[in-house]
Amino acid sequence: PKAGVWISAQVMKNSDDFKFRFYDEVAKRPAWLTGVCHAPWVSHTMKECRERTPMDLPIRSYPDICHLLCCQYPVHAWDPIWAITAGRECYNPRPRWHRQMHRLNKPYCIGNLAYSEGIADDVSKFIWLDADWDDSIPYMKTLQDYARMFISPQHAAEIASTIALFEDIYEGPAVSNQAVSEVYKQLHVLEDAMHAESYEAGYGADSYRFQMPRLMSTFYQYIQRRAIRDKAVFDGVFQGLDEASDMDAFAETIRTRLAETAVSPDEALKAELWSLGDVCWEKINWKLSTTRHFSPDYSRGGFLDTADIPLCNAWWLEANLKKLSGMATQAEKQTFLKQLRDCHTAGPGGKYISFGSPESMQYLRMEKTWWEEPEAITIPRIEQHVGMFGPDVNRETSPDIDKTTLERVSSILGYYHAPVKIEIDGLVPGAAYEVRVVYPMRFGWKGQKDIPSYITVDGERLAFLGCVEGDEWVYRYALPAGKVNAEGRVTLEAQKDVGPRGTGFTEVWMLLR
């Protein structure tokens, strides 16, 4: 009878009306109300939550510490390669960012009860616990204590610095990230050193808390090698197209070239990876795959299943090559193949942007940085849509495999009321353009005339021209002459009607008319 209740403004289909009614009820102070929670899928910041909650009612934070994408605190600007492989629930130490999240939360709440879904966020649990105990403790001290307690007192500093280095893997292009090999090498050196020393069972190199980063570093090393190889294959797949006369024969050449992406780039490293996975399964029942470790799904921590997927647009190209059989002439087939080759270009005076590329970040216009607001509620975020690259996708029956490219994994997405603005340069001053847009894939806006989103320039809504025939994910708009300024720049804003959770951009083409 003396129990109290904590309530949260979490709701999947949010609206301002719900928010206002929620806090109206909080203000009535029912006798059973003990406090308010701030958690994932609350449509407003903790600061606003505190401002709307009576000051004598405490607020408790429930941060999501276990996910890297489609979550409360995503890894912003994550390379699509990592998103489709490591995925949402891999081993995910983020000490630097999690301490920043805690620092931003602290003024508005009485403490944190982290939302966890298992062992993958093991390091983050200690980062948050230590910060709640004493927020003056540097996160490197927390990592050293963690390593000293659970792995090796002799190597606490080296282990801590190596775990911290995982965050550098999340930044920049996967194919050129030097932190990948650095972490892998450092953990090998530490393993050799600890094997030469004496530890009780379950400590040193035998500690599962050491085997977890060992496995993850091996995974990143393997995926990077695969990504480098697959990129090289795809970069050369259309070589010779302009000179070819027999398009059916050239299509077979493409298939032969793409076949290399189905082969492991390093069998020894792959064997090491799966061996470590088996060790972690035996030690702690870590469900790393659906085939050997009983994960319910690859997206629920079974990320080892992604080790064999091609890390280029091989599936997309193979699906489109099948369309050649329905074309009558060599000229028609060659035109189609050239369209596939050039689909991510915009022609003279134009511009193509995919928000999975590091270069795309230069076009974003935000009032704050992600470091200042990692939850990205009042500012847009980079959101990842990875389902079409899953190892469980049936490439024969999936209706959109011929439209699924790496360029469509990442979106700049504004939830709720976050403005989504991009300033595009390099255009022809004063010229008219056709603007082509792929919206965030998670909303499923494909070929619909009445979607609750649209594009504006200088506050004026652009005229909708329909969708691209054959690829209805692409929406077409008319940018009138005079909107591109004298410096060759124009600012596009993705807007939404009242109701949907958000909007944004995945791909943008600016085609000179």
Identify the function of each model-found stretch:
Residues 1-156, 160-161, 242, 246-312:
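Catalytic-core regions of glycoside hydrolase
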Residues 7, 36-38, 59-61, 114, ...:
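Generic structural hydrophobic/aromatic packing signal, biased to beta-strands
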Residues 12-14, 80, 106, 142, ...:
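Bulky hydrophobic/aromatic packing residues
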Residues 20, 50-51, 72-76, 125-127, ...:
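Surface-exposed beta-strand edges and their flanking turn/coil or helix-capping segments
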Residues 23-27, 90-95, 157-179, 490-498:
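A broadly tuned preference for mixed-charge, low-complexity surface segments
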Residues 116-124, 136-351, 358:
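C-terminal non-catalytic alpha-helical accessory regions
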Residues 339-513:
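Extracytoplasmic
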